[in-house]
Swiss-Prot record:
Name of the gene encoding the protein in the UniProt record: CTSB
Topological category with respect to the lipid bilayer: Peripheral membrane protein
GO molecular function: cysteine-type endopeptidase activity; endopeptidase activity
SS bonds (residue pairs): 93-122, 105-150, 141-207, 142-146, 179-211, 187-198
Protein name: Cathepsin B
Oligomer and partners: Dimer of a heavy chain and a light chain cross-linked by a disulfide bond. Interacts with SRPX2. Directly interacts with SHKBP1.
Source species: Macaca fascicularis (Crab-eating macaque)
PROSITE patterns per the UniProt record, alphabetical: THIOL_PROTEASE_ASN (PS00640), THIOL_PROTEASE_CYS (PS00139), THIOL_PROTEASE_HIS (PS00639)
Amino acid sequence: MWWLWASLCCLLALGDARSRPSFHPLSDELVNYVNKQNTTWQAGHNFYNVDVSYLKRLCGTFLGGPKPPQRVMFTEDLKLPESFDAREQWPQCPTIKEIRDQGSCGSCWAFGAVEAISDRICIHTNAHVSVEVSAEDLLTCCGIMCGDGCNGGYPAGAWNFWTRKGLVSGGLYDSHVGCRPYSIPPCEHHVNGSRPPCTGEGDTPKCSKICEPGYSPTYKQDKHYGYNSYSVSNSEKDIMAEIYKNGPVEGAFSVYSDFLLYKSGVYQHVTGEMMGGHAIRILGWGVENGTPYWLVANSWNTDWGDNGFFKILRGQDHCGIESEVVAGIPRTDQYWEKI
């Protein structure tokens, strides 16, 4: 009997796979198919004339890796608003509004971490300290604790590195902001742009424990440390409470090719091939036309999606968005002299 049951399961799975048409990840056909499904989001072109290898490299997070211990949350008596946007809650913290660009490198795991860490330093010092924490420092110096640099990494390892080794400051490519700005240039998503083409190639830059010329203090003096790092349970309310009390978090989820085409609305996977795991920064939540969503910042520049941001279905662990949330608290004692 068992073989009948197994055969039936295989046939159902095969039937489901065949019921979803196959499209090239960036095709007009995929855009049109999504927009005809009467779903909760709209598709359009964000990338033109780029290699599929580049698109897959953008998704550089290893899902299901080791996690730090969960922090115990007491949310029973906490009244959470129907909608929340960290940009509005902490308007004096400019990094919350920022969208970065990881370039041709699978460094999303590092960007999601340093973006949320930057936000939390500002929030937990009551905006007395505002710093862009360096994705370059984390990407290049974390080593095997975090994974494999531009070839992918673990968000949990990134937060652990912050607490153990610290991270220096560093802004966007060619910004000359901070100790170690990002060294990988943005690449051109569009046909007639001025930036270099997007490819799936490129090595991880070398770890350098020296700040760029003209910057002071020294590399060692510029380090910012975390007090602790932890996982957040996949409970919708626990994640909301964590953001509400402590600021944006890093999350990760499975990316399918239809997500690459996101323009507006609340993303729900419709069709398309699996591209890989992707880490992002979750900064709020809300409800749009009756559909609950997470408000999320991506790291694919502002010409992707909704000015670099997107919304994704909340409360159903859609594409695993609620299963890989990590966060941490800054060590505020290091800033007492500045405060």
